[in-house]
C-alpha cells in the first residue's frame, strides 16, 4: 500500500482497511439534535441527527459503509440513498412530535443533508484510518504535519495551521487532528527526521499553549436544556486555532478502528516503547471514559443487557509479558465487560460514582496482581471514599482462545488486609504497584 496522505480522491481508488473497520465498529446512538452526539461519540457511535427510526439509521449506515469501502462518489451516494429514504418516509420537511410532545417543522432528508452526511462521515472515517496507519509507522515517521487545502473555501483558522509540524504524540493532536469542523478538508502528513531536515521544517509544541473550556453547543427547544461540550484552543502567540464546537477530539484515538483490530495491529509495531505510548494514550482518553458512561446510561434503561459488551481498556505490555512468563501463553490484551457481568457483580461492588469512572481507574490501578491458584489477573483500584478495594478479575482463561482478542472482567469488593495476607502467603504475586492498607 502506498505510504501517502489519504484524501477522498485517493481513497476512492484505494480505501484504507482501517477506515472500513472504523465504520463497522460503530454502534447506534440515536439523537434528536446533533449536539447531543458531539465529539466523543462521533468516533464511537454512528449517528445521524433526527434519525429516530432504526430502519432509517440502518439504511444510512449501510450506504455510508459502502461509500467508505467502495470509494463511491458523493453523487452516487445521494442517488442511491435518496430513494431508499423517501420510501421510508424520511425525506423533506415534516411536522415531528418529539419525546416531550412538542411539535415543530424540521427538515429530514434532502440532497444538502445527504451531502453533509457523506462529507462528515467519510472524512472522519478516513481520518481514523490514516491515524492508524501513521501510528503504526510513528517510529520511522514521528513528525506529523498539518496540511490545509489553501483555496478560497479554507477557513482562515485552519489555514493558519498549514505546514505546522508536531510530534505524533504531542498533546496538540488529541484535540486538533482533522477534521476540525463541518466539511473540513484538512489532513495530516507523516514525515521522517531526514525529510524534516530536507524541507527545513521546525517542530512546534502544544504543551503550555492548549486551553480547554466548556462552551454551549446548543439548546433543546422543547426543554430549554443547554448542551455543553469541551472546546480546546491552540494559541502559541503567533497562531491561534479553535476547532468548531463539538470537534475538539481525535477520531483516530477515539475509535482507532475496532478495538480488536487495534490489538492485532499493535503487535506489528516494532518499537516496544511506542506500543506502550499508544496503549497509555488510549487507556487515558476521555473518549473511552465517555463511551463507557454512555453505555452505562443506556443499559440502565434496558431490560436486555446480557450480550452487550464494552471495552474498558488495554492490558499493558509489561503486564502481558508477566502473564506470559507465568503461563507460557501470551494473553489477549483487550479488557471488556458485558451487561451480565455488570448486572451481577459491578452494581453490587461499586457505587454509581465509582462505576462511572471504571475505565479511568483501570488505566491507573493501585496494583496489578496475579492469582497463582486461579490463574487470574487482579486489577486493584480504590473506591472514592477509600473504605474498600475493588478487584477487577479477568476471566479464567487469560490465554488467547480461538484467536480471541478480548478478556472478560468481573468485579468484586475485598479488603486490602485480605489481599495483603494472600500476598504474604505466596498465593498472589505483585506484578505492578502495591496494595495500600488504611491505618
Swiss-Prot record:
Record Pfam families: Phage_Mu_F
Subcellular location: Virion; Host cytoplasm
Claim: Secreted is one of the keywords in the record: no
GO cellular component annotations of the record: host cell cytoplasm; virion component
Domain of life: Viruses
Signal peptide (residue range): none
Keywords from the named record: Host cytoplasm, Late protein, Viral capsid assembly, Viral release from host cell, Virion
Coiled-coil region(s): none
Expression induction: Expressed in the late phase of the viral replicative cycle. Expression of late genes is activated by the viral late transcription activator C.
Function in brief: Involved in capsid assembly.
Protein's UniProt name: Putative capsid assembly protein F
Source species of the chain: Escherichia phage Mu
Gene that specifies this protein: F
Amino acid at each position: 500500500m502506498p505510504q501517502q496522505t489519504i484524501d477522498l480522491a485517493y481513497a476512492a481508488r484505494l480505501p484504507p482497511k482501517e477506515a472500513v473497520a472504523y465504520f463497522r465498529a460503530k454502534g447506534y446512538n440515536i439523537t434528536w439534535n446533533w449536539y447531543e452526539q458531539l465529539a466523543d461519540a462521533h468516533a464511537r457511535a454512528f449517528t445521524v441527527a433526527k434519525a429516530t427510526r432504526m430502519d432509517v439509521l440502518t439504511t444510512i449506515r449501510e450506504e455510508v459503509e459502502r461509500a467508505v469501502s467502495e470509494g463511491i462518489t458523493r453523487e452516487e451516494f445521494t442517488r442511491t440513498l435518496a430513494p431508499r429514504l423517501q420510501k421510508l418516509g424520511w425525506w423533506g420537511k415534516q411536522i415531528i412530535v418529539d419525546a416531550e410532545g412538542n411539535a415543530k417543522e424540521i427538515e429530514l432528508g434532502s440532497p444538502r443533508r445527504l451531502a453533509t452526511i457523506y462529507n462528515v462521515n467519510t472524512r472522519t472515517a478516513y481520518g481514523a484510518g490514516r491515524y492508524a496507519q501513521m501510528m503504526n509507522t510513528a517510529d520511522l515517521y514521528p513528525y506529523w504535519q498539518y496540511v490545509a487545502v489553501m483555496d478560497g473555501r479554507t477557513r482562515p483558522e485552519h489555514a493558519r495551521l498549514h505546514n505546522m509540524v508536531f510530534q505524533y504524540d504531542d498533546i496538540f493532536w488529541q484535540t486538533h487532528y482533522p477534521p476540525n469542523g463541518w466539511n473540513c478538508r484538512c489532513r495530516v502528513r507523516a514525515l521522517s527526521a531526514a525529510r524534516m531536515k530536507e524541507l527545513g521544517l521546525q517542530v512546534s509544541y502544544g504543551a503550555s499553549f492548549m486551553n480547554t473550556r466548556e462552551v454551549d453547543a446548543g439548546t433543546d427547544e422543547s426543554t430549554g436544556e443547554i448542551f455543553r461540550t469541551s472546546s480546546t484552543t491552540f494559541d502559541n502567540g503567533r497562531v491561534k486555532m479553535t476547532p468548531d464546537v463539538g470537534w475538539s477530539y481525535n477520531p483516530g484515538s477515539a475509535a482507532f478502528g475496532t478495538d480488536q483490530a487495534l490489538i492485532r495491529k499493535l503487535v506489528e509495531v516494532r518499537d516496544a516503547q511506542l506500543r506502550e505510548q499508544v496503549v497509555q494514550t488510549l487507556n487515558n482518553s476521555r473518549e473511552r471514559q465517555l463511551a463507557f458512561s454512555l453505555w452505562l446510561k443506556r443499559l440502565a434503561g434496558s431490560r436486555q443487557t446480557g450480550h452487550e459488551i464494552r471495552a474498558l481498556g488495554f492490558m499493558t505490555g509489561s503486564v502481558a509479558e508477566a502473564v506470559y512468563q507465568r503461563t507460557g501463553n501470551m494473553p489477549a490484551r483487550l479488557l471488556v465487560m458485558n451487561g451480565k457481568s455488570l448486572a451481577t457483580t459491578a452494581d453490587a461492588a461499586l457505587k454509581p460514582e465509582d462505576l462511572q469512572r471504571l475505565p479511568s481507574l483501570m488505566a491507573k490501578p493501585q496494583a496489578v496482581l496475579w492469582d497463582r491458584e486461579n490463574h487470574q489477573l487482579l486489577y486493584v483500584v480504590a473506591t472514592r471514599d477509600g473504605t474498600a478495594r475493588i478487584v477487577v478479575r479477568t476471566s479464567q482463561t487469560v490465554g488467547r482462545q480461538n484467536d480471541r482478542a478480548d478478556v472478560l472482567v468481573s468485579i468484586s469488593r475485598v479488603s486490602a488486609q485480605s489481599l495483603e495476607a494472600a500476598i504474604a502467603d505466596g498465593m498472589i504475586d505483585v506484578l505492578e504497584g502495591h496494595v495500600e492498607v488504611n491505618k
